[in-house]
A protein has these predicted regions:
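Terminal substrate-recognition subdomain of acyl/acetyltransferases
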Residues: 110-111, 139-157
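Acetyl-CoA-dependent GNAT
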Residues: 10-78, 82, 95-97
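Conserved GNAT acetyl-CoA-binding A-motif
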Residues: 102-113
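Conserved N-terminal entry element of GNAT/NAT acetyltransferase domains
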Residues: 1-16, 153-157
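Conserved active-site alpha-helix within GNAT-family acetyltransferase domains
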Residues: 92, 115-132, 140-141
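Conserved acetyl-CoA-binding loop-helix of GNAT-fold acetyltransferases
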Residues: 81, 87-100, 124
Length: 157
């Protein structure tokens, strides 16, 4: 049986494979919610602050996440894992690797839309809910405000 080659590395978030994987994964979520104009504007204005990392299996991109350090907190955004690679440790390995790429991190923070069911995914990864509120960034498909949830995880040395 041939050995599978795994690799995680920093990428350009505009790279074609990153954009395609993100679009494919987030298309599923667009059945549940969509971004408001405010969210699109914010994402575009802060894009340069984020570093993008990708998880490759045999040179095929199967997971991505964006990260930025704010003080001693590492904030994660746009975590996406190809459907056929979910529940196989890709997100956990990606997050663990990204934490090692920044100095003096005490906690990792991630936001998600409650109605997607992703809160349970992050809880399974060791994150705890710290706040939830009606979002100005996301609207549910029925036109009501989505509930944004912030989850955090302590980082141990």
């Amino acid at each position: 049986m041939p050995k599978v080659k795994l690799m995680i590395k920093q990428l350009d978030s505009n790279e074609k494979s990153v954009v395609e994987l993100s679009e494919r994964c987030f298309d599923e979520l667009r059945q549940v919610y969509r971004l408001t104009e405010l969210a699109v504007s914010y994402k575009n204005s802060t894009k340069s602050e984020w570093s993008c990392f990708g998880f490759h299996v045999d040179e095929v991109l199967v997971g991505v996440v964006e990260a930025k350090q704010v003080g001693s907190e590492l904030q994660l955004s746009s975590l996406a894992v190809a459907p056929s690679f979910r529940q196989k440790g890709v997100a956990r390995k990606l997050i663990d690797f990204v934490v090692t790429q920044f100095k003096h991190i005490n906690s990792v923070s991630v936001w998600c839309v409650e109605q997607t069911g992703n809160v349970a995914v992050f809880k399974a990864l060791g994150f705890n809910v710290v706040q939830r509120f009606d979002s100005d960034f996301f609207i549910l498909s029925d036109g009501s405000k989505a509930v944004e949830v912030q989850l955090k995880q302590k980082v141990t040395a």
